[in-house]
Each structure stands twice: as structure tokens, then as C-alpha cells.
């Protein structure tokens, strides 16, 4: 087979990394049951971290980052998958310790591979990617705990981020009233277009004085940032409400007491998209292809780039300069 292209991150000096598009062969890929011709990948915050010397993502260099990929099977030793099958690969060790999706071909264990559900294209799957998948997991967790639109307002922290944007849009699509919080100035129109009914500042979810129990404001909440905002949401969620958490950009420490749990019956639901069990993973993708699908939003939130554009886009991502989703076309 002829050579194909992939984006490599390398580290020659302890505090310095470099990005370069190189040509490699299939034999250069790691072991796995399924070989896939990648059509699309995406950009997540974790992908940006993987390019940094101090990002604490990549341990061995040179390495191909990219935690998302969607494409078509070209070879499989697992009978569950055959040549020509459209598939999705996200999470697990892809783009972390296993060559990732910024490559025209990947080879992965079959247990990482999810069949593309009916109603979704490969392009659409990567517009969602890990960010959309995590948001969908969060919304589904609320629903599993009985959340319904008539319950009242649902708060979303970090709403202009990848997960927060999708969470806002999916909740709105399902009929929930969304209060979106963001630290980025001038994003009110963007959040309103996603479906937010109310937009508040980051500071609104980070009061100087944090009370163990504050005035009940939200029926439920999706926290994407951790730290103080999560503590605040626990103290302001109404009796019996649920709060999901999936990020820590605002801090990994949580300041709370038992009061929200034993006096208001609050449910704190952890969301882990990396090692989500396979049956649940398929269920979430089914929802993304059906009732969670955002047909009217997918194109306007998406900027399509090529492998050649990736280095600049990844740097922009780390600096917080990306709004919406960057889709990487590899076909």
C-alpha cells in the first residue's frame, strides 16, 4: 500500500514539542483488530493538551494525537466488523497512548469501535465527537434520574465550551429551559442560537461567599467545569434535582457539605466518557442519531479544516480561541 499522512507531535527537548505531518505505512500503526480509513476527526481540548510538553497527556514520542475518528473499515479480524462498515472510534486510549485520529488510517482494538448508527453520517458523528458524546451522556443521565422539561430551569456551566455547547443545544431541543453560564464575553447571541433561554456570567456561578445551601434556583444542572461552579450548583439545585459533572477546567477540588444530599436529596452524577461501557456507548450514539440530533445547528457551529490546518487550529484551541466545532476532513 502507498504511504499515507498523519500529524505527529514530537518532543526533542524537555519543555518543547513540535508538530509535523509525515508519511507512514500501515505497518507503522500499532496492533489492533480493526483497520479503518479515517474520513473525519475533530478537535477537543484534550487534543490541544496532547501537543504541549506539559500537557500530561502523551508519554511516548513521536505520537499521533486525536481522540476522535470516524471512517470505514478496510480490514478486520473480528467478525463483528467487515470491510466497508462505517464506524466511530472515540475515547479509550485513542490519541492518548495509542496512535490517534489525526491520521488517514488507524488500527484499533475492536472493543473501541462502534457501528455508525442509522440516521447519522460520518461527518455528523465527528461534529459531535467526544464533546457531543459527553454532553449526550450528561443529558441522558439527567433523564435516567427522572428529569423532565416541566421540572424547571436547567443550568449549564462552561456553556461556550464543546461539551457545554452541545448540552445547551440538546436540552433546548428536548424542550428544557436552559440557563447558560460562560466566562467568554460577547457570546450571548451564540448561546441564544444554541437554545439558551438565559445567559449569565461565569461569576454568577462563583459567588465570593459560598453557602452550603443557598436559594433553590435550578431543577437540574450540567456542570462542565468543576471547582466553585459545581459547588454552587449543588447548593442551588432544587429538592430532588440532579447535577452531572464531567470537567475540571475551573478546578478539581469540590467544596460542599452533606446538606445538599441529605436535606434536598440532590443526586451528583459523574460522567466518564472515556471508559463508558460498550452497551451504554451504543445507546448514547443512538440518541445522538435520533432524539438528540441537532440538524438545524450542525453546519453553523462547524468549521471544516484539513490535516494541513491542524497545527494552527490546535494552538488556537489551547488559547481558547475556538468557538463551536472544528471538523478535520481526512478523505
Walk through the language-model features, giving the residues of each.
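C-terminal hydrophobic helical "lid"/dimerization subdomain
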Residues: 2, 282-331
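Glycine-rich beta-strand-centered segment in the early N-terminal region that forms part
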Residues: 27-43, 53-94
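NAD(P)H dinucleotide-binding glycine-rich loop of Rossmann-like/cofactor-binding domains
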Residues: 90-154
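Short, glycine/polar-rich helix-capping loops at beta-to-alpha or helix-loop-helix junctions
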Residues: 102, 183-190, 252-258
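Glycine-rich NAD(P) Rossmann-fold beta1-alpha1 loop
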Residues: 132-133, 158-165, 226
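Surface-exposed amphipathic alpha-helices with a cationic face
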Residues: 165-173
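Adenosine-nucleotide cofactor-binding segment
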Residues: 172-228
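Glycine-rich phosphate-binding loop and adjacent beta-alpha segment
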Residues: 228-294, 330
Amino acid at each position: 500500500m502507498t504511504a499515507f499522512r498523519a500529524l505527529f507531535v514530537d518532543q526533542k527537548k524537555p519543555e518543547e514539542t513540535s508538530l509535523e505531518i509525515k508519511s507512514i505505512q500501515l505497518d507503522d500503526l500499532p496492533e489492533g483488530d480493526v483497520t479503518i480509513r479515517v474520513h473525519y476527526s475533530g478537535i477537543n481540548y484534550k487534543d490541544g493538551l496532547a501537543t504541549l510538553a506539559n500537557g500530561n497527556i502523551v508519554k511516548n514520542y513521536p505520537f499521533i494525537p486525536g481522540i476522535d475518528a470516524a471512517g470505514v473499515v478496510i480490514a478486520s479480524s473480528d467478525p463483528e466488523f467487515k470491510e466497508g462498515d462505517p464506524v466511530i472510534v472515540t475515547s479509550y486510549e485513542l490519541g492518548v497512548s495509542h496512535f490517534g485520529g489525526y491520521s488517514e488510517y488507524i488500527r484499533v482494538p475492536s472493543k473501541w469501535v462502534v457501528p455508525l448508527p442509522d440516521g447519522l453520517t460520518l461527518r455528523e458523528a465527528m461534529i459531535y465527537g467526544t464533546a457531543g458524546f459527553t454532553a449526550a451522556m450528561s443529558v441522558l443521565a439527567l433523564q435516567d434520574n427522572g428529569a423532565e422539561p416541566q421540572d424547571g430551569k436547567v443550568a449549564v456551566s462552561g456553556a461556550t465550551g464543546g461539551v457545554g455547547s452541545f448540552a445547551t443545544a440538546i436540552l433546548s431541543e428536548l424542550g428544557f429551559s436552559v440557563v447558560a453560564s460562560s466566562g467568554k464575553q460577547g457570546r450571548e447571541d451564540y448561546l441564544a442560537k444554541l437554545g439558551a433561554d438565559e445567559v449569565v456570567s461565569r461569576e454568577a456561578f462563583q459567588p465570593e461567599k459560598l453557602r452550603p445551601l443557598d436559594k433553590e434556583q435550578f431543577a437540574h444542572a450540567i456542570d462542565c467545569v468543576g471547582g466553585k461552579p459545581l459547588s454552587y450548583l449543588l447548593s442551588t439545585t432544587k429538592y430532588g434535582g440532579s447535577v452531572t459533572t464531567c470537567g475540571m477546567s475551573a478546578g478539581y477540588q469540590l467544596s460542599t457539605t452533606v446538606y445538599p444530599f441529605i436535606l434536598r436529596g440532590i443526586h451528583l452524577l459523574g460522567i466518564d466518557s472515556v471508559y463508558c461501557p460498550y452497551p451504554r456507548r451504543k445507546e448514547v450514539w443512538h440518541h445522538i442519531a435520533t432524539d438528540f440530533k441537532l440538524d438545524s445547528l450542525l453546519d453553523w457551529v462547524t468549521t471544516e479544516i484539513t490535516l494541513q490546518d491542524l497545527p494552527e487550529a490546535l494552538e488556537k484551541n489551547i488559547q481558547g480561541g475556538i468557538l463551536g466545532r472544528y471538523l478535520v476532513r481526512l478523505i
